């Protein structure tokens, strides 16, 4: 595997898409996510990545499911606790949860699973982490790819920071925006480390995909129940 070329090309691609999103040039998410995944698959194939490098080896699927289900359950417990504690449940008061039941199903199944969790995990814990491990070893690769994962979330945070009513007031000034973006980058960096650990421990991409779905999907689901 040409790990250096694979990592470099994937990083350039992700940077280009992130810049395009910042200027509203990436088009519909279904197109940009599909294009990202297809190009990453091409990069991985041309550079000789194996199924094991990408976390897609069949023999590791069972471990991936086991670790992923465990992570899913842990996230559920944490979010339920947040929803039940008066001092923290305001963080689930998000205008993005003010949607119909039909729209909720679409967001959970299409937007979160197919257009977010799977493409992002294939990119960061599949192609980048797989090639990064060959270049620097597991822990340095985890740190680098998790940092990139945090930076990837700058543009979405700028677009959605006013949706959460608990923090929307902070988005009204530049200092507040910097604080919110920095907090999101740090939080997603930590999440990236956890997802990387799941991927390395189980050797399967299924584990971080399930954890990612839990983090995004269960948060939206519980916020929807809070809103309704």
Task: Describe each PLM feature range.
Residues 1-47, 63, 67, 98-107:
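Alpha-helical transmembrane segments in multi-pass membrane proteins
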Residues 4-22, 48-56, 87-92, 130-137, ...:
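Hydrophobic alpha-helical transmembrane segments
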Residues 10-22, 75-81, 146-156, 215-221:
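Aromatic-anchored segments of alpha-helical transmembrane domains
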Residues 14-16, 24-27, 89, 169, ...:
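N-terminal start-of-chain detector that recognizes signal peptides
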Residues 42-51, 198-201:
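Structural signal for the C-terminal ends of transmembrane alpha-helices
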Residues 51-119, 134, 163-175:
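Juxtamembrane helix-loop-helix connectors linking adjacent transmembrane helices
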Residues 105-228:
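Transmembrane helix-loop-helix hairpins at the membrane interface
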